[in-house]
From Swiss-Prot:
It is found in: Cytoplasm; Nucleus. Keywords: 2Fe-2S, Cytoplasm, Iron, Iron-sulfur, Metal-binding, Nucleus, Redox-active center. Residues 49-146 form the Glutaredoxin domain. Disulfide bonds: none annotated. This is Monothiol glutaredoxin-S5. Transmembrane segments: none annotated. Belongs to the glutaredoxin family. CC-type subfamily. The gene is GRXS5. GO terms for molecular function: 2 iron, 2 sulfur cluster binding; metal ion binding. A motif (Responsive for interaction with TGA factors) lies at residues 144-147. May only reduce GSH-thiol disulfides, but not protein disulfides.
Length: 147
């Protein structure tokens, strides 16, 4: 339980340390973006791309999206409604998809849906395939549905 702190008019309140201001956060993000042109940031991007490649190979259905993106939830709920439990992998940006999508392939938009180790597309493509009735056979062929 929490212990109550007795009130004292003689003892001043200790002010908490100020949180990072928006300016500080923007400076950190800008520094990270500048550092991303070479060196360590590229190595982190390559590690993230390798993680995505491994996850695509392991999962019959994988949803790759940007951290904190609400569209991941939309894709996941659509697939769960069909009886599929997709794996979800959150990444920092679209650079993680470079090694997964073939060089001549279409550009991947996040969230990207991989079915059977192949890129199905983004949310718009998933909705189009679902509405046309082609999604269930694709999921069965990938082994994500057993019905």
């Amino acid at each position: 339980m929490y212990q109550a702190i007795p009130y004292s008019s003689t003892r001043p309140w200790l002010r908490p340390e100020p949180a990072a201001s928006v300016v500080d956060v923007v400076k950190v993000e800008t520094t990270t973006a500048v550092a991303g042109r070479g060196g360590e940031a590229e190595v982190v991007g390559e590690e993230e791309a390798a993680e995505v490649r491994r996850a695509v190979a392991e999962s019959p259905v994988l949803v790759v999206g940007r951290r904190g993106c609400c569209l991941i939830h939309v894709v996941k709920r659509l697939l769960q409604g069909l009886g599929v439990n997709p794996a979800v992998h959150e990444v920092a940006g679209e650079a993680a998809l470079k090694g997964v999508v073939p060089a001549g392939g279409e550009a991947a938009a996040l969230p990207a849906v991989f079915v059977g180790g192949k890129l199905l597309g983004g949310l718009d493509r998933l909705m189009a395939v679902h509405i046309s009735g082609e999604l269930v056979p694709i999921l069965k062929k990938a082994g994500a549905l057993w019905l």
